[in-house]
Curated annotation (Swiss-Prot):
Substrates-to-products reaction catalysed: malonyl-[ACP] + acetyl-CoA + H(+) = 3-oxobutanoyl-[ACP] + CO2 + CoA
GO biological process: fatty acid biosynthetic process; secondary metabolite biosynthetic process
Annotated spans, ACP-binding: 239-243
CC per GO annotation: cytoplasm
Name of the protein this chain belongs to: Beta-ketoacyl-[acyl-carrier-protein] synthase III
Pathway(s) annotated for this protein in UniProt: Lipid metabolism; fatty acid biosynthesis
Gene responsible for this protein: fabH
Subunit structure: Homodimer.
Family: Belongs to the thiolase-like superfamily. FabH family.
NCBIfam families xref list: fabH, PRK09352.1
Enzyme class: transferase
Function: Catalyzes the condensation reaction of fatty acid synthesis by the addition to an acyl acceptor of two carbons from malonyl-ACP. Catalyzes the first condensation reaction which initiates fatty acid synthesis and may therefore play a role in governing the total rate of fatty acid production. Possesses both acetoacetyl-ACP synthase and acetyl transacylase activities. Its substrate specificity determines the biosynthesis of branched-chain and/or straight-chain of fatty acids.
Amino acid sequence: MKKTNFLSFGCYLPKKVLTNFDLEELVDTSDEWILRRTGIKTRYIAEEEDVCELAFRASLNCLERAMHFSQKEVDAIIVATCTANKRLPAVANMLQARLGIGRHILSFDVNAACTGFLYALSIVDAMIVSGKVSTVLLVGAEAMSTIIDWNDRNTCVLFGDGAGAVLVSAGDSGGVLYEHMACDSSLGEALLAEVGGTLKMDGRSVFEAAIKRLTLAIGEALKTTGISVEELDYFIMHQANIRIIELIGEKIGIDRSKIIVTVDRYANTSAASIPITLAYMDSHGSIRKGAKILFAAMGAGFTYGVTIFEY
């Protein structure tokens, strides 16, 4: 049975950098307040690029990093996003065209908000294990700035734009060791954006639900697999808020040195945060072969997921 392997990583961040000090000029906030409550220092904002363009540039970066690989080998394209620039066609369809892949391959979007990348990875794993595909371009891309109310200091300080891409291929070892994707729909109104509207969030409910659901889900993952916290090499959470990341890390008892944090640089990029973080780690040479990675994410819906992956 084939295993799901990560072949290469790529990312793209827009040119405009918005600092906490810039936000002090827009709303009643301060660098000290934002940093203390979120851990965020900067975020990137797309002024000219739409989500498809962000996805395209991240994909090119990813494909360029893949050794001895031709994009003609891509069997499918999946884009995780909740900020598509068109209702139709899907961003993945447009990305396929931008990449010049004229063959009739599978391409579609996944919208599970901030959990989107893990939901999409679950789909990719099922397709590779079943033998349906051999190579998939998996992208998380978001233009969160397009659904933000820039007069709402409770939300505008949290989000950023960007895209991350992972080239996933069939291999003989490693891969997904465990995954659990779910949705607690009773919290569906806690975080939402109406069509044509801006994002609304009950921050307290989201914070408490994230801590509770993910701590329990991670505990179940470790119990089911028999993998101890000490055996994990990295803990990569959706980069929403440093307090959530650190508190869950503390609750599961993982060494702080294994917790990967990029929210300070990029803010909350929704479905793009995990692949951007992977690309960041790869560019710094910090992912070793055979490493066990614990992924966890939560997002609107209220979706959440946990994946244990051997690199």
